[in-house]
Amino acid sequence: ENFYKFPLDEFQRDATRVLIDGHSLVVSAPTGSGKTLIGETAIMNALMRGKKAIYTTPLKALSNQKLREFSKKFGKRKVGLKTGDVEVNAEKAEVMVMTTEILRNMLYSNAAGGEMDKRLDDVGVVILDEVHYLGDSYRGTVWEETIIYCPSNIQLLCLSATIGNPDDLSGWIEEVRRSDKSDEKLCKTLVSDYRPVPLNWFYSMKPNRDWPGLGYLLNSRGTQMNEELYPFTEEGMRENFSRYGGEQESYYNYHNNNRRENDQKSMRRRLVPHVETAVGQLISADMLPAVWF
């Protein structure tokens, strides 16, 4: 708490105790609930024990973001980056940020009986951010193999906002990484449903005189779609067609014709903004920085 100059909440204190005790940990909590702070605590705990830390993300953009954040927190000389495209201070860093694929590849050589990657020397903790990617049909094996091949002496911290079965994941991690026959629980679970920062959904369209381009996707109660978007629904288009004298049968003919590929492309040209337009809307709304998928 002295490091952060503000009191930690109960959820963060519980996580800190688990990490200091040396256990691996699965954390499932909404965005904005303090998972990043828990990750930073794991890093500090490793550094204080004279160990190194590895922090993985699924995206290069997120890795770059974490490099900036951790450089401010721990100092540029202590933090490095490796994404496949870029290497920053990779040989000397005590805190390495990388994509999960990079770490998996580092672990492969050791699993295949080769010489242990020197960058894993003295690593005390591996932090897997967005660990729910385990369930991804295309990339999930990367997270699975990373957990399986990670040496059992290295502490694991798995972070996610959306994982649906954290206890099952914790049990599986313990099963594949246990190196003894004791009954002690080596991987624990912490779950929180509290969302201190509200999650808001927005839509972005090309602006014109009828709509501003960027707005809330849901109504003020969060129960239905924003009324501004009603004219673009099938029901809204049918009402508009009838309002201007169209018959229902004619509407269905019109609707089916608009299913054609050229009309869908026309709809996209009219409504979907260019990247520059969408970024300009985010700038005007003071919603940067952002990650574009």
Regions found by a protein language model. Give the residues of each.
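Conserved adenine-nucleotide phosphate-binding loops and their immediately adjacent elements
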Residues: 1-3
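Conserved P-loop/Walker A NTP-binding site and adjacent catalytic elements of P-loop NTPases
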Residues: 6-178, 183-197, 201-205, 289-293
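Conserved interdomain linker/interface between the two RecA-like ATPase lobes of SF2 helicase motors
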Residues: 148, 155-157, 162-171, 179-293
